[in-house]
Amino acid sequence: STLLKAMLGTVSPVSGSVRRMQGLAVGLVPQVETIDWNFPVTVAECVGMARARGVRMPWITKRERAEIGSVLDRLGMAELGRRHIRELSGGQQQRVFLARALFTNAQVIFLDEPTSGLDVRTRHDVLHLLDDLNADGLTIVLTTHDLNGIAAHLPTVVCLNRSVIGAGRPDEVLVPDVLERTYGSPMEVLEHGGMRVVVDAPLGDNVLPLRRSGGASA
């Protein structure tokens, strides 16, 4: 979260610097846990608020309403424009803030833990949506701790722990040495269905047998 804030210019880096291209339009999709979903706005109003900053009369114009409808339709939410944001599912909540970012004509979108708290199916839906947006030319930068559900499916992965530990394709970065230096504990990488799966490495005598009900050990 702090890294994204530094890249967006909302906090100053303690060291180093951030260079931003002049005229580059960026958008942020925050963690869903940081949003007050009881705030009294509809989906369309929430999206329209993205352009309200610095506007004396922040009312949605007829043209903007049409643009909002187009953005929501692109994300498969055309029928939800008048629904209150608290009535949305986790995946729909993520799409609302993606719509906000797209409504500002962002060229780069930053997402903070976009799959946090989502079930497996919804997580895959969000991932496929991001992949489609990226294929359409949108640059996407996201943070995640979900190595198996998200990181292994990304085209480029960067592991950070006070500095860059590794950067490259998932098969280059998701390796035991890089992961151990990133997380500070032993990790193992397995192959399953052509994909890399990261698991905690056993710690010798600290590993206890899993007991099933009835007293049998696994």
What are these regions (language model features)?
Residues L8:
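Helix-to-loop junction immediately C-terminal to a conserved catalytic motif
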Residues G48, K62-L80:
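Conserved ABC ATPase "signature" region
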Residues V120-T122:
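Helix N-cap at the start of a conserved alpha-helix in ABC-type nucleotide-binding domains
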Residues H84-L88, Q92:
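Conserved ABC ATPase signature
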Residues I109-D112:
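Catalytic Walker B motif of ABC-type/P-loop ATPase nucleotide-binding domains
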Residues T144-H145:
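H-loop/switch region of ABC-family ATPase nucleotide-binding domains
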Residues V175-P176, R181-A218:
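ABC ATPase nucleotide-binding domains
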